[in-house]
Regions:
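Short aromatic-enriched loop/helix-cap "lid" or pocket-rim segments at secondary-structure transitions
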Residues: 72, 111, 149-151, 173-174, ...
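Short, well-ordered alpha-helices that flank and scaffold nucleotide-derived cofactor binding pockets
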Residues: 49, 53, 114-118, 180
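C-terminal catalytic histidine-bearing segment of alpha/beta-hydrolase fold enzymes
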Residues: 187-233
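Serine-hydrolase catalytic machinery in alpha/beta-hydrolase-like enzymes
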Residues: 6-98, 200-213
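The feature captures the conserved acid-bearing segment of alpha/beta-hydrolase catalytic domains
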Residues: 124-187
Length: 233
């Protein structure tokens, strides 16, 4: 399916930030993509283009890089505010709303869907509203934000969860724990990729990062195909 691709600025509380829009012709759904710590959806563009080719308009905000591996309440809430601006402007009641995120981006999607996230210092983060996502595709999400009792009790949506066995940022044991928690609320499609690390799900790796995948091209093509099938099913 044809789609157009543009990058433009929008405003949140009189502050401008950038979004990339991949607008599908006669879109079946709207996908909100949330990048990880680095904040750039450009590193995931081949994946997002495949999703758009399957008939979904993709909205991908750009964020400033988080300076620390342990982000603060203020830093995460700033991202959530930008995401809520995007959701208000681009989600429509007549279109299916889907979230797709990597790492801390996947964590923020769970918070937007009703998860009660706590930072490492014990401060709560979260949106002004709970957003009704029909599906969430979560790639190597940061899990520690949701390990307190009842944290994900109000998340009620179909989940696609994928993690790498060689991930040292989000270890497989944490991903399996998240799967067990989410299964209490609904259906979870879980894939544990044997050779994948935390950054294997990025089409463009961060500087000085080497991937554990022996054949990145084949892996990324399969990843994009699987996610596109999930969001359009």
């Amino acid at each position: 399916m044809d789609f157009s691709e543009i990058t433009q600025s929008i405003q949140n509380n009189k502050k401008e930030f950038t979004i990339t829009i991949l607008e599908a012709t006669q879109a079946l759904c709207v996908v909100i993509f949330v990048a990880g710590r680095g904040g750039s959806p450009v590193r995931h563009l081949p994946l997002l283009r495949v999703v758009a080719q399957h008939g979904c308009t993709v909205i991908a905000p750009h964020f400033e890089m988080l300076p620390s591996l342990t982000p603060t309440k203020e830093e995460l809430n700033a991202r959530i505010e930008q995401l809520e601006t995007v959701l208000r402007d681009y989600s429509h009641s007549h279109q299916t709303l889907i979230g797709l995120g990597h790492s801390i981006g996947a964590t923020l999607l769970l918070a937007l869907a009703g998860g009660k996230a706590l930072t490492f210092s014990g401060h709560g983060i979260g949106p002004h509203s709970i957003w009704k996502f029909e599906r969430l595709a979560l790639l190597a999400p940061s899990v520690d934000f949701f390990l307190h009792p009842g944290a994900l009790q109000t998340v009620n949506t179909q989940i696609y969860l994928r993690n790498g066995r060689k991930d040292t940022v989000t270890p497989p044991s944490k991903a399996l724990l998240l799967k067990q928690i989410l299964e209490k609320q609904g259906h979870v499609d879980f894939l544990l990729d044997e050779e994948a690390g935390h950054f294997s799900y990025m089409d463009e790796l961060p500087p000085q990062i080497e991937d554990s995948q022996s054949n990145r091209e084949v892996f990324l093509v399969d990843l994009a195909r699987n996610i596109a099938q999930f969001v359009t099913t």
